[in-house]
């Protein structure tokens, strides 16, 4: 299931850097993280759903690239984001 408009707007409001911000790296990573977590729970129940697994791997790769970009450009924003999302141990 795709992310609902209400849930996406809630995530955007939480991670936006300014009013109307929908494309910053923080927002993109937060939305991707929600989608990845949702797909992970689906994959646990439907182990043979290979198409969904492939989509999950694409989203993980996209998020990894965005995080690498953010770490290269602004380390402080990167650290705040991974801490707020709980991505690293």
UniProtKB/Swiss-Prot annotation:
One of its GO terms (biological process) is translation. It comes from the Bacteria. Gene3D superfamilies: 6.10.250.3130, S15/NS1, RNA-binding. One of the primary rRNA binding proteins, it binds directly to 16S rRNA where it helps nucleate assembly of the platform of the 30S subunit by binding and bridging several RNA helices of the 16S rRNA. One of its GO terms (cellular component) is cytosolic small ribosomal subunit. NCBIfam families: S15_bact. Part of the 30S ribosomal subunit. Forms a bridge to the 50S subunit in the 70S ribosome, contacting the 23S rRNA. The keyword Ribonucleoprotein applies. SMART domains: Ribosomal_S15 (SM01387). This is Small ribosomal subunit protein uS15. One of its GO terms (molecular function) is rRNA binding. Belongs to the universal ribosomal protein uS15 family. The lineage of its organism: Bacteria, Bacillati, Bacillota, Bacilli, Lactobacillales. The keyword Ribonucleoprotein applies. It comes from Streptococcus pyogenes serotype M1. PANTHER family: RIBOSOMAL PROTEIN S15, BACTERIAL AND ORGANELLAR, SMALL RIBOSOMAL SUBUNIT PROTEIN US15M. Keywords: Ribonucleoprotein, Ribosomal protein, RNA-binding, rRNA-binding. It holds the Pfam family Ribosomal_S15.
